Amino acid sequence: MDLTVINDRGEQVASVAASDETFGRDYNEALVHQVVTAFQANARSGNRAQQTRAEVSASTHKPWRQKGTGRARSGRASSPIWRGGGVTFPNKPNENFTHKVNRKMYRAGLAAILSQLAREGKLKVVESLGIESPKTKLLAGKLKSMGYGKVMIIADAIDDNLWLSSRNLPNVYVVEPHQADPWSLVKFGNVLITKAAIKQFEEMV
């Protein structure tokens, strides 16, 4: 699989050969869906919670006597059928959202996404993304001249200048190959990758 190499103006200047095992796989939609949803599920913090009828702060006084009023019997205001009462089957923070995906499947899904992006022309290669100083304006200007607004940058090594320049850009995500995840690849759509990072991906996937 040949990948397009571009310069600072977004113009194609060369091509680089990449492994078909990593960048030339067929797109497996079911596998990609599985690894993306598993990644999202595993990222959940599990911080949702509701209160049971035992945990709701309410009076334990019986609202009215059991018989003779003509109304339905009622024991206490924390009943789940009352407004402001507890929840019958509440969510709790200790729920386990983990989805297990085998390492081989995860890497195959990652390779399928990279391959599809390469076929669609959304994965481009650059020699390097060196930034002279930690200035957001410098990186934003360079990406704009290359024709990118929203992009995921995969660099073989992230120096302080690149990291500091990118962290205030909401539509720019900078990672090293081992940090790349399927959800971000799908979300950002456009990927800039350095030549050295390609080799790291091939060894990893």
Swiss-Prot record:
Record has Lyase as a keyword: no
Bias-annotated ranges (Basic residues): 62-74
Example GO molecular function: structural constituent of ribosome
Keywords: Ribonucleoprotein, Ribosomal protein, RNA-binding, rRNA-binding
Region listing for Disordered, in residue ranges: 43-96
GO biological process, one term: translation
GO cellular component: ribonucleoprotein complex; ribosome
Pfam families linked to this entry: Ribosomal_L4
Domain of life, source organism: Bacteria
Keyword Ribonucleoprotein among UniProt keywords: yes
Positions with biased composition (Polar residues): 43-60
Quaternary structure and interacting proteins, as annotated: Part of the 50S ribosomal subunit.
Protein's job: One of the primary rRNA binding proteins, this protein initially binds near the 5'-end of the 23S rRNA. It is important during the early stages of 50S assembly. It makes multiple contacts with different domains of the 23S rRNA in the assembled 50S subunit and ribosome. Forms part of the polypeptide exit tunnel.
Family indicated by similarity: Belongs to the universal ribosomal protein uL4 family.
NCBIfam families: rplD_bact
Protein's recorded name: Large ribosomal subunit protein uL4
Organism: Thiobacillus denitrificans (strain ATCC 25259 / T1)
Chain's gene name: rplD
